[in-house]
């Protein structure tokens, strides 16, 4: 068949219509049939036409894949093209899979048995493959069937488009040389074999959809001709024997008719000599399939496995059958170490082996297979060893065991925590932690440790009893032995009710696995954890303990989902991570709404329930939602640092931090998302990650952020790819698993880049480590952070883990503020995230700047925070706390979006006043440093509102610009700042509408304002920061009016100005942030 003509016509069609429209394409194919043929200069019009039939329909279908709809260029295929176009339009094929591969220019020697018109050199258009009825490429089919084939062929033409050369249809392993005919024109034959698995028309690229079969062609699946390509099937495209694309019919409601399928080794039944042929040759030659000893189907990648069924180059080259496949696939059951087969069971088994079909006697049947091992009597040590083995042996049992344990513990534990934990793989651990928390409420500080250890039930047990690897034993014992379990319960203070040893073992295994990083962290940070617990400040204790628990907990705290996301981020596909994050979001959303609000009001311990419940619950909650934990860390810290008033905002913030958890998803999704995820992980796990390299990535950003307060912050930015802060850090620390995600997503969220900028900026400022206002901390973190970006794990190590832990305690607020906001920001919604991310970047930048340039309140939003930080006039500590809380809330308000709408509203109302207040606070210092700071304060308020409004993305109630503005106005009115309210309103509306520049700027400024405060509180200066913040707050009120007026008038400009000002301070960070968006 005249594939060449087809290709040419396709090229022509492409030229004509670029396939913008299936309709257009159809028209082109219809009107261009002859013109295409003419263009093709095809000598055989019939062949061309039949080819074109397939091609035209194929081309029209290719609309989805590329601009190949226009490829349909057959005279006869005009009808088909129209039908195909209609079909495509109906199915939304238009560009559904617009994957047009670059044409393969290498000309194939024209051994085109069929190419009647090699004369025309087809321009290898992206859609050069002519659609052929897959199996009868040359067989001419009725046009109606051609149309059907055409729809299938469209996919083929897509392949052709990808091949952009005549495609060879190899059916039954026979090359379609007519297809190759086009190759003579200098295009490589593209075997665009559309293998329609489910009765989809299989269209070979140069195959005519004629009724008569071609010589060598076996109608492998003529059904393709009769059935519409659109109905239940898959189109597989092969080029040069290499699988290039597979399209499956999209499910109803999909935008496009065809969706690309991840490559599967689906080989439709074919006459191909060997379906298992695995072409290994990397030689791409234009020889016909069997002429090349190295095989035409070449691929260095694994696509060779998908070698075209039609074109198997080396049938003799069988993929080596796996020798022991039956053994490889066998599943082994390793009995629990503590159960042994009884003699009777062994006898029965031996008899069954000899006479498998002989029925068992009832006595035998009733006999227990396992005799309880006496080993259980050996005590914890033996059990522990056995448990460890069981961990390896009985992972399968883990799920059941975990469930059992959870159920057993559930009564003792907080249901919500239990549920959340149960939802995640570490429910039991969480439960243990919860029970421990409840029982250890006297020793809540210990509880955070358990939470750290929550990663591991053992860890939990341990924390209850002791912070030692011994906890593993109790946990293992717990899992292994009911008796041991009881002992554990007693030690934990919570009796575990008759856990099945097996279940216990599995749970222990899980916990042990989970606790490895936690244990490392625990060992490294036990003293820190103890110190945190000793700090006993709910916020500090909660924050630190959460930090530690997060550290330990990240795997377990995050729960299975979190663990997988955080721990295995490196190994888990982004999609899975996102899914897991979504699970977490749903789980933690509930926690957020329930615990978050409760926690927010209750403690500042954490928007998340873990924080809310204080240390006792917080550790389990943290476990349940590591994201929650980390942000709460920051939040609680600010709370203690600032004051109660700060606490509730901090808590609110924390809830968003929880949202961070959700934002983990966002972080996964967006560049910031890596940060977001990391921020949740980073917040939650960062602390825990210090010891654990994986977690450390996440951990570091926050840790660095938290630890040096200022230095930490920049360090986090630089060091921690995972930290929301470290979105930029992503650039700095690409090693973080999240970091990768962040980088990946950074473009979407442009958080990564901003962070990167921030990172570089931080780097620069940090490079000038002399700048960091926070003395040693900043400096210390500075240099390591530099390294840290490369190795986030290193960054935390900059400071002794204990120190880091403590610092985290204090830095938690800043970390929360910067880290959580970023996750929150990212998470709140993609736009929000961008705002937020930018804001967090600015925040980060600002905290860094505060640290780096703390005395200079240069940074607009930052400057104000910075000035409070470095030289804040002390005012009302409660006001300062409120400001800090507001800042935190501002950072986290986007989180509320993940909260429920009502929570968001609450957050907006609560935070808006706080925001207003906070922004006033921030703004007044800002105002003093900058004329724009007033605008910055207004922008901050607007950013707060915008943050609230971004939530509109999630809940469409009054969090839109107007709703946010109203909330902001109400808040402002509550705070007696009418002007900021209006400013907020414009900003709110504006950020929503223009989240990128002005909104970002606004967010950035507010974030900076908020972050510096939070950062201040987060640092050791936390107490001082209280006064600073209060100082900020008190000026804020005055500043608020100025700022409101300034902001209202120049919200955008002020935001932009802030951006410039931030640019000055965080030149890389903010501008990049803006550029990001």
UniProtKB/Swiss-Prot annotation:
Regions of compositional bias (Basic residues) in chain numbering: 984-995
Ranges annotated as biased composition (Gly residues): 596-607
Domain of life: Eukaryota
GO terms, molecular function: DNA binding; transcription corepressor activity
Biased composition (Low complexity): 26-75, 115-130, 269-286, 293-308, 640-684, 783-798, 811-829, 865-876, 996-1012, 1023-1055
Modified residues (Phosphoserine): 720, 723, 746, 753
Location of the protein in the cell: Nucleus
Biased composition (Polar residues): 704-713, 772-782, 837-846, 1056-1070
Keyword 4Fe-4S: no
Gene: H
GO cellular component, one term: RNA polymerase II transcription repressor complex
Residue ranges, compositional bias (Basic and acidic residues): 408-439, 449-459
Protein purpose: Is a potent antagonist of neurogenic gene activity during sensory organ development. The expression of distinct cell fates by the trichogen (shaft) / tormogen (socket) sister cell pair depends on the level of H activity. A certain threshold level of H activity is required, below which both sister cells adopt the tormogen fate.
UniProt key word DNA-binding: yes
Residue ranges, annotated region (Disordered): 14-75, 97-141, 269-322, 340-368, 408-504, 533-876, 976-1077
Record's protein name: Protein hairless
Keyword field: Developmental protein, DNA-binding, Nucleus, Phosphoprotein
Tissue: During embryogenesis expression is primarily in endo- and mesodermal cell layers. Ovary, embryos, larval and pupal imaginal disks.
């Amino acid at each position: 068949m005249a594939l060449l003509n087809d290709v040419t016509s396709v090229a022509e069609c492409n030229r004509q219509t670029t396939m913008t429209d299936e309709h257009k394409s159809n028209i082109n194919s219809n009107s261009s049939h002859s013109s295409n043929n003419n263009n093709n200069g095809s000598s055989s019009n019939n062949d061309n036409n039949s080819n074109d039939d397939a091609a035209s329909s194929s081309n029209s279908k290719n609309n989805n894949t590329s601009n190949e709809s226009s490829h349909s260029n057959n005279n006869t295929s005009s009808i088909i093209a129209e039908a195909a176009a209609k079909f495509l339009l109906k199915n939304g094929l238009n560009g559904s899979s617009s994957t047009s591969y670059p044409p393969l220019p290498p000309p194939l020697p024209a051994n085109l048995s069929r190419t009647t018109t090699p004369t025309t050199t087809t321009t290898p258009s992206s859609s050069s493959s002519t659609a052929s009825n897959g199996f009868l490429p040359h067989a001419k089919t009725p046009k109606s069937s051609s149309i059907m084939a055409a729809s299938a062929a469209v996919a083929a033409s897509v392949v052709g488009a990808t091949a952009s050369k005549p495609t060879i249809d190899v059916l039954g392993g026979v090359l379609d040389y007519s297809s190759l005919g086009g190759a003579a024109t200098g295009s490589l034959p593209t075997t665009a074999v559309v293998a329609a698995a489910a009765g989809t028309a299989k269209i070979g690229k140069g195959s005519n959809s004629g009724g008569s079969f071609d010589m060598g062609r076996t109608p492998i699946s003529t059904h393709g001709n009769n059935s519409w390509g659109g109905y239940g099937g898959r189109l597989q495209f092969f080029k040069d024997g290499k699988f290039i694309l597979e399209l499956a019919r999209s499910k109803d409601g999909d935008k496009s008719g065809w969706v690309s399928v991840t490559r599967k080794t689906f080989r439709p039944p074919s006459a191909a000599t060997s379906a298992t042929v695995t072409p290994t040759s990397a030689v791409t030659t234009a020889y016909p399939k069997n002429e090349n000893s190295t095989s035409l189907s070449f691929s260095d990648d694994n696509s060779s496995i998908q070698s075209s069924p039609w074109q198997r180059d080396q049938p003799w080259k069988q993929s080596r059958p796996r020798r022991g496949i039956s053994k490889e696939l066998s599943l082994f059951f390793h009995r629990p170490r503590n159960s042994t087969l009884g003699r009777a069971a062994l006898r029965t088994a031996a008899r069954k082996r000899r006479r498998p079909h002989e029925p068992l006697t009832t006595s035998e049947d009733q006999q227990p297979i396992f005799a309880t091992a006496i080993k259980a009597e050996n005590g914890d040590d033996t059990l522990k060893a056995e448990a460890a083995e069981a961990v390896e042996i009985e992972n399968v049992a883990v799920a059941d065991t975990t469930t059992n344990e959870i159920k057993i513990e559930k009564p003792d534990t907080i249901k919500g925590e239990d549920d959340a934990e149960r939802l995640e793989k570490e429910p039991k651990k969480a439960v243990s932690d919860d029970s421990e928390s409840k029982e250890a409420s006297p020793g809540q500080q210990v509880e955070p440790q358990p939470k750290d250890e929550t990663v591991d039930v053992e860890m939990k047990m341990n924390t209850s009893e002791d912070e030692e690897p011994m906890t593993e034993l109790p946990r293992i014992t717990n899992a292994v032995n009911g008796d041991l379990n009881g002992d554990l319960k007693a030690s934990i203070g919570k009796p575990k009710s008759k856990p099945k040893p097996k279940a216990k073992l599995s749970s222990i295994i899980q916990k042990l696995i989970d606790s490895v990083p936690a244990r490392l962290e625990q060992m490294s940070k036990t003293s820190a954890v103890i110190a945190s617990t000793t700090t006993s400040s709910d916020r500090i204790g909660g924050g630190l303990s959460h930090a530690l628990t997060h550290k330990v907990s990240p795997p377990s705290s995050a729960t299975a989902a979190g663990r997988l996301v955080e721990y295995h981020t490196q190994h888990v596909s982004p999609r899975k991570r996102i899914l897991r994050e979504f699970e977490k979001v749903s789980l933690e959303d509930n926690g957020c709404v329930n615990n978050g609000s409760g926690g927010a009001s209750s403690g500042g311990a954490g928007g998340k329930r873990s924080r809310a419940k204080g240390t006792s619950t917080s550790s389990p909650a943290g476990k349940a939602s590591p994201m929650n934990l980390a942000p709460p860390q920051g939040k609680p810290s600010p709370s203690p640092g600032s004051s109660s008033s700060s606490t509730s905002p901090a808590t609110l913030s924390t809830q968003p931090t929880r949202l961070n958890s959700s934002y983990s998803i966002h972080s996964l999704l967006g560049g910031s998302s890596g940060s977001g995820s990391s921020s949740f992980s980073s917040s939650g796990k960062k602390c825990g990650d210090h010891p654990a390299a994986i977690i450390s990535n996440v951990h570091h950003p926050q840790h660095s952020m938290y630890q040096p307060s200022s230095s930490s912050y920049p360090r986090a930015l630089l060091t921690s790819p995972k930290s929301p802060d470290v979105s930029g850090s992503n650039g700095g620390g690409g090693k973080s698993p999240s970091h990768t995600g962040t980088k990946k997503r950074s473009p979407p969220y442009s958080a990564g880049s901003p962070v990167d900028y921030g990172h570089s900026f931080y780097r620069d400022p940090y490079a000038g480590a002399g700048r960091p206002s926070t003395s040693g901390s900043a400096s210390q973190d500075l240099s390591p952070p530099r390294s840290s970006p490369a190795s986030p794990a290193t960054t935390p190590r900059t400071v002794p883990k204990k120190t880091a832990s403590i610092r985290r305690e204090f830095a938690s607020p800043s970390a929360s503020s910067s880290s959580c906001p970023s996750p929150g920001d990212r998470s709140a919604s993609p736009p929000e995230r961008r705002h937020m991310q930018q804001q967090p970047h600015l925040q980060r930048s600002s905290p860094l700047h505060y640290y780096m340039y703390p005395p200079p309140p240069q940074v607009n939003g930052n400057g104000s925070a910075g000035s409070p930080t470095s030289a804040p006039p002390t005012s009302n500590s409660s006001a300062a706390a409120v400001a800090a809380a507001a800042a935190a809330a501002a950072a986290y308000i986007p989180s509320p979006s993940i909260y429920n709408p009502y929570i968001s509203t609450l957050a907006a109302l609560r935070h808006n006043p706080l925001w207003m207040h906070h922004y006033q606070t921030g703004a007044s210092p800002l105002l003093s440093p900058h004329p724009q700071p007033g605008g910055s304060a207004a922008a901050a308020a607007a950013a707060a509102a915008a943050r609230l409004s971004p939530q509109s993305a999630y809940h469409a109630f009054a969090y839109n610009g107007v709703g946010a503005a109203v909330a902001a106005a109400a808040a402002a009115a509550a705070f007696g700042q009418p002007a900021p309210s209006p400013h907020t309103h414009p900003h709110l509306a504006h950020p929503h509408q223009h989240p990128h520049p002005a909104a970002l700027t606004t967010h950035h400024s507010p974030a900076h304002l908020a972050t510096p405060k939070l950062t201040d509180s987060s640092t050791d200066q936390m107490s001082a920061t209280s006064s600073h913040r209060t100082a900020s707050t008190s000026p804020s009120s005055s500043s608020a009016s100025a700022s409101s007026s300034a902001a209202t008038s120049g919200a955008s400009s002020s935001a932009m100005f802030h951006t410039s000002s931030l640019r000055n301070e965080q030149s890389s960070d903010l501008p990049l942030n803006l550029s990001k968006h």
